[in-house]
Amino acid sequence: MKLSLSPPPYADAPVVVLISGLGGSGSYWLPQLAVLEQEYQVVCYDQRGTGNNPDTLAEDYSIAQMAAELHQALVAAGIEHYAVVGHALGALVGMQLALDYPASVTVLISVNGWLRINAHTRRCFQVRERLLYSGGAQAWVEAQPLFLYPADWMAARVPRLEAEDALALAHFQGKNNLLRRLNALKRADFSHHADRIRCPVQIICASDDLLVPTACSSELHAALPDSQKMVMPYGGHACNVTDPETFNALLLNGLASLLHHREAAL
């Protein structure tokens, strides 16, 4: 699996791995790259079956497989220890990595994540699946911003959204791969295992997230033994895109604090 690695800003700089959500594209993290690369070696990638890592996914594709293939790619690149920043599905992969490779994951940042899928989130995906079956890739892509961004943010950026739609259609991961990745997301359940995650965790959520209620982050916070929760008042599900200034400040402070906390505990 292909990874994109930034040059380390100094010798032995900590590594931060960015894991996007269901869309799978590493470019989702573009608003974070410049600030992160000043202090960390940053790893981005397109998830298997998407972008520049094309593949046909098995019907039983799982979050555990997503975590294993990423860890193996990191080890092959010479990376043994890394912090994880995961958004939604990416946060699930991050938790799986922390469970399966505890000696490697130094810190976990969960952005609009959850322990197991919430009934409201499941309803949203059911609607989106019906759109995919009835209207194909175009209907899926055109509906996606409604679940990602606040209404006023979208209304002020119509040309940008039209360009994003065209790009998403051109690089659509395919119906079968999308549904298999979505099914992996829906099957994931960390409610009985989260208390085994021992690395420090920062939980970031947005109070106006239409797709994932903030209660999901509260449940995560209660279940994770060494966690802190930060709530952004605005930004929607893709709060790192819509309000990068606020998000980046939380992320940078969280990474620095938790990495220091972990080193002090060793």
From Swiss-Prot:
Q: Which UniProt keywords apply?
A: Hydrolase
Query: Keyword Hydrolase, does the record have it?
Result: yes
Task: Quote the cellular component terms of the Gene Ontology held in the record.
Answer: membrane
Mention any Pfam family matching this sequence. Abhydrolase_1
Q: Which InterPro entries match?
A: AB_hydrolase_1 (IPR000073), AB_hydrolase_fold (IPR029058), AB_hydrolase_sf (IPR050266), Pyrimidine_utilisation_RutD (IPR019913)
* Gene Ontology biological-process entries: nitrogen utilization; uracil catabolic process
The yes or no answer to whether the keyword Hydrolase is present is yes
Listed under catalytic activity are: carbamate + 2 H(+) = NH4(+) + CO2
Gene3D superfamilies given for it? alpha/beta hydrolase
Annotated Gene Ontology MF terms? hydrolase activity, acting on carbon-nitrogen (but not peptide) bonds, in linear amides
| Enzyme Commission (EC) number | 3.5.1.-
NCBIfam families xref list: RutD
> Its biological function?
Involved in pyrimidine catabolism. May facilitate the hydrolysis of carbamate, a reaction that can also occur spontaneously.
Family assignment?
Answer: Belongs to the AB hydrolase superfamily. Hydrolase RutD family.
**Protein name, please?**
Putative carbamate hydrolase RutD
Record the organism. Escherichia coli O8 (strain IAI1)
